Amino acid sequence: MAVFYFKVLNSILYIIILSDIISFLKRYVFIFRMEVFMALILPKGYDQVLSVRETQEAIKYIRDTFQKEFGKEMNLERVSAPLFVSKSSGLNDNLNGVERPVSFDILGIPNEEYEVVQSLAKWKRMALGEYNFAPGEGLYTNMNAIRRDEELDNLHSCYVDQWDWEKVIRKEDRNIKTLEDTVKTIFKVIKHMEHEVWYKYPQAVKHLPDDIFFITSEELRQMYPDKTPKERENLITKEHGCVFVEKIGGALGDGKPHDGRAPDYDDWELNGDILFWFENLDCALEISSMGIRVDEAAMESQLKAANAEDRKNLPFHKSLLAGELPYTIGGGIGQSRLCMLLLNKAHVGEVQSSVWPADMIEACKKNKMILL
């Protein structure tokens, strides 16, 4: 009889211990899920202002109007661009070097792998050469990409839509003045778009600063040595409203880069990001990443610094190192990011149709952020 009671007692203790373990695991999983989901910001008192249909109408208006004015101010022609390129061409953008492109094969073209573009940085430069564009002339295109490894939040989507642009310059124009003059032109077009949107949607438009402030990533590091690069960007952009952070990719005084950049398109000494302060999310909003592209010497040194000298054997890199490609300046301007900025939206999913975690969609809906 004692043995029976002992077994019952053991069973009860086992159930209690198992229950405690399950409770602990549930709590741990919940905490982990919350940490992953903490990237979502839900602004207090947020109101979408425009209905979904009004938002769709405004998106079309901004995109149609901006690309016409942008092309005119920058002397750029609209061209068609690929959705995917062959892996062996070396034309795809490696971004920070760790993002996995979406790849596939094609039944009618055996022994070749294709990748959905992550950007058109290298393709545009090759196209300018093939289409015989002269210095001062350029192109822009609608670029649609899938970035499967993006961390999804208010600003980041796995679907990327941007105006990719590129312009031929002379070798002697590869300098800071050319870069900053181009940045000022882009800022002027964006600022003018604020007025265009205000005429049609005065209740929704965000008011932008009148000027853009220039600073190098090293100057920014020295200004805020104890902050992370992202914290530095937030502090300087909040102070000035709109900032162009220059020289991104190379090691700074502390031995670390401000941010990652592929070694084979931007010259790390002649590039940067355009940032606007965005009150809805209390952070800097990157609208454009751009730069003067590598020449032969910059390509050599940056490939070496990135331990990527094996890329020299790819067709694009061979052509560039042989001096067969034009010198260029180029970049991308986020279409959804620009709509988000001008319409004062709190989530990029309010201005583009993409995919999101179900609990993010529900949380946004409860806070009047309707994802398309």
Predicted features along the sequence, with ranges:
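Short, positively charged and aromatic/hydrophobic N-terminal segments
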Residues: I12, I16-I17, I21, I31
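Extended, charged alpha-beta segments that form solvent-exposed binding/catalytic grooves
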Residues: T141-K227, E231-N234
